[in-house]
Amino acid sequence: MAEYTRSISFYGREIDINIGLMAPQAGCGVWLTSGETSILVTATRQPGRPGVDFMPLLVDYEERLYAAGRIPGGYLRREGRPPERATLISRLIDRPIRPLFPEWLRDDVQVVATTLSVDDTVPPDVLCILGASLAIHGARIPFNGPVAAVRVGLVKDEFILNPTYAEIEAGDLDLVVAGCADGVIMVEAGANQLPEKDVVEAIEFGFEAIQELLKAQQQVLADLNITPVELPPPPKNEELIAFVEEQAQEGIRSILRQFLDKTSREQQLEELKAKLEAQIQERPEGDPLRLYLLENPKELDNQFKALLKKLMRQQILQEGVRVDGRKLDEVRPVSCRVGLIPRVHGSALFNRGLTQVLSITTLGTPGDAQELDDLHPVDEKRYMHHYNFPGFSVGETRPSRSPGRREIGHGALAERALVPVLPKEEEFPYVVRVVSEVLSSNGSTSMGSVCGSTLSLMDAGVPIKAPVSGVAMGLIKEGDEVRILTDIQGIEDFLGDMDFKVAGTRAGITALQMDMKITGITVDVVEQAIRQAKAGREFILDKMLETIAAPRPQLAKTAPRLLTFKVDPEDIGKIIGPGGKTVRGITEATGAKVDISDDGTITVSSSVGGQAEAARAMIENLVRRVEEGQVYLGKVTRIIPIGAFVEFLPGKEGMIHISQLAEYRVGRVEDEVAVEDEVVVKVRSIDHKGRINLTRLGISPEEAARVRNHHH
């Protein structure tokens, strides 16, 4: 492709587009630059592999630390496993483009976004979505685009388009909305308990701005003479369709109307499908349908699922009844328990229908904060939420592996939902980690994690500002007919058109995540879903608060105890000591852990009472300013003919002249004191060189006793 360049102005920012200069062997390489951020996005297509019955799309966001002028740490000094943020951006690019490919496309498609340079002001993720849309079209891959995305912030009650990191931090909203010609296709948001109406206005504001990016893309495609690539659907086997409908339609309808639980429903559906397979096998060997299924063994299952999807959706659209008998806006039964697990700092078991999540809270010290090594300006996290989804939660056997993209994404969503209600570091200096173990899954385990984690944090005594609950909303849409479902279960997610997760407090929303399986919905439908979700969230929240109404007033006995105080930043070196010798000595002597911040904030933690207080006393003694007239208990460190040296504070030593050892005349220093003797001394004077002169004279018996008692 010949090199093509174009610059577009978008709400005060210039976006430079270059197609054809880079990655000549990729299907298409799009180089985008905005400010000092530069991204290369490629799209490549290969013929599909035999037997694949799904669309194998792979989206990767590659962070390179050279983009910020940094060299990676570690022995190899090169990037390793993608950081969590890169995984989340990969998902953010994937989610708005996936629904726009024809569902029958079986070719391998890969989209790779590589950061070449980034500034430290604006996130690069929405630029990647623009590049992905252009690259897919440029690679002549069948795609119902273009698609674009924008970020919306809210600062001082005003919406801001593509806000800076500083504006996001200062504001009450961080929302990414993606859309195409047919409507909104993806929403991702974190908010500071924002009212529903404000969130809807933000989505509408962003969707209107997206139209400019869609028009700009259309102009680029017209300049390059790129027209949409049509991929007609594969021919249908009408005989198979008729056979499945004739033999299974009434059976499926009957199963759906029995309002069975998940296990019983799946068992009956499998038995019905097995009967169809048996009927096929009973046909003569030369029967055309039998021969077709021998060549296409997955087609019977595919057609059976298609009929199940059609009938389930009809039942919802025409009768307003769901597969488990619930109304469209009804939440499954909810039950909760807290404090189940001994020794942990907080625990909760949350049940909603057949979805069950166990959330465990652990409190740590400031040194336990997660250090981040990526291109984001934030370099550590005080709150971590980890989500695990084992095979047994859906009745499957599979090996346990490191967290995949889904686990990372669900954990990040639950984390985003809870961060706005966590106490400030000054009020609660603990680092908090919550792990959500999915023990049983039948829809919306991420929102189950939000609910379970709220309960677990309250059980741990974390003073959250308000409890958070979450619910997943679904959609069934046929033409103009729309039905929104509250608290979707697995089959409604799988056969429906939308998965819209909403989390928040009574005051407002803290997190949103909307994904579509169709090519977009109107803002009005989004608003309806958000409003219906509020009723569902509040129903769940009421059930949660019946279990525990407020955070426990005290932390668990097993939680570390923290003492936080300030010292002069100039004294940090004294506390650390050469090579860390002094602070290690404090830790070894007391058993407490010491964390030191650059601003002079000291956090001392211990699991045993008294250890933290002892460490604090040692640190305060280290940095205490010595003044004339102060009395200390010290230890004799060495003796010289004219006096004795005494260490009266860690690292601080003074000399008692022989004339100051006693009221009477002392002939030899050794006659009065010996090395290692404890002596009560008073600061007599400090000379211009900082040398400290001590005395044993002029100290009352009461004062000496007080100092000895305080020390011991």
Swiss-Prot record:
Main location: cytoplasm
GO cellular component term of the entry, any: cytosol
Catalytic activity: RNA(n+1) + phosphate = RNA(n) + a ribonucleoside 5'-diphosphate
Cofactor(s) listed: Mg(2+)
Binding site for Mg(2+): D493, D499
Alphabetized PROSITE patterns for the sequence: KH_TYPE_1, S1
Compartment list: Cytoplasm
Domain named KH: residues: 560-619
CDD domains, alphabetized: KH-I_PNPase, RNase_PH_PNPase_1, RNase_PH_PNPase_2
InterPro entries reported in the protein's UniProt record: ExoRNase_PH_dom1, ExoRNase_PH_dom2, ExoRNase_PH_dom2_sf, KH_dom, KH_dom_type_1, KH_dom_type_1_sf, NA-bd_OB-fold, PNPase
Record-annotated S1 motif domain positions: 629-697
GO molecular function: 3'-5'-RNA exonuclease activity; magnesium ion binding; polyribonucleotide nucleotidyltransferase activity; RNA binding
Record protein name field: Polyribonucleotide nucleotidyltransferase
Organism: Synechococcus sp. (strain JA-2-3B'a(2-13))
Encoding gene, per UniProt annotation: pnp
